[in-house]
Structure formats: C-alpha cells, structure tokens
C-alpha cells in the first residue's frame, strides 16, 4: 500500500512538473506575445516575493524554484470585530510535495 501511495505521489508530481514546463514553453514560443514577454520581464522585477502581502495584486507573485507562488488568502478578525481579507504569496501544499519529490529525484539520479 505504501508503494502504491508513493508511486501515485511521484506520478502526480511528475505530471504537475511536466505540465508546468509545457505551459511555460508554449508561452515563450508564441511569437505574437513578444511584447507581452518584455512586459512580463519588467513585471518580474516588480513581482511580490514569497511571504509578502498580495491583497491588492493577487496575480503578481514571483516564481519559485519550479512553480509560481500563489496568492493565499485568509479572513482576519480585527480587534474592532471587523472581518478583513489578508493575502500573502506562498507555495501551495501540492507544489511543496512536487518540489520535495523532484529534489529527491535530483539527489538520487544526479
């Protein structure tokens, strides 16, 4: 049972990694988006780093090692009993698992 679970996690990780790489390749290969690529390069300089607030710009998080960080939001109750939404750039759990498996694979296979 452990082997099946480990194999399943590895399969999902490899699929996530390959699909993310394919999407990046398609974005870069499209000649019509040359100007948008230049704009993206400028936007990368202004991207929001990990663990910083992204409440006002939910799609402006930087890229991590393998995946782009996602804006994760939570509801916070202030002392005056008002609910506000706070968001930060972070790595989702399934991306953390994928990075862990890829890291182990790189250590094992070179």
From Swiss-Prot:
Residues 1-20 form the signal peptide. The keyword Disulfide bond applies. Keywords: Disulfide bond, Knottin, Secreted, Signal, Toxin. Pfam families: Toxin_35. Transmembrane segments: none annotated. Its main location: secreted. It comes from the Eukaryota. InterPro entries: Spider_toxin_CSTX_knottin, Spider_toxin_CSTX_Knottin_CS. Belongs to the neurotoxin 19 (CSTX) family. 03 subfamily. Disulfide bonds join 47-62, 54-71, 61-89, 73-87. GO terms for cellular component: extracellular region. This is U1-lycotoxin-Ls1dd. Residues 21-44 form a propeptide. It is found in: Secreted. The presence of a 'disulfide through disulfide knot' structurally defines this protein as a knottin. GO terms for molecular function: toxin activity. Expressed by the venom gland.
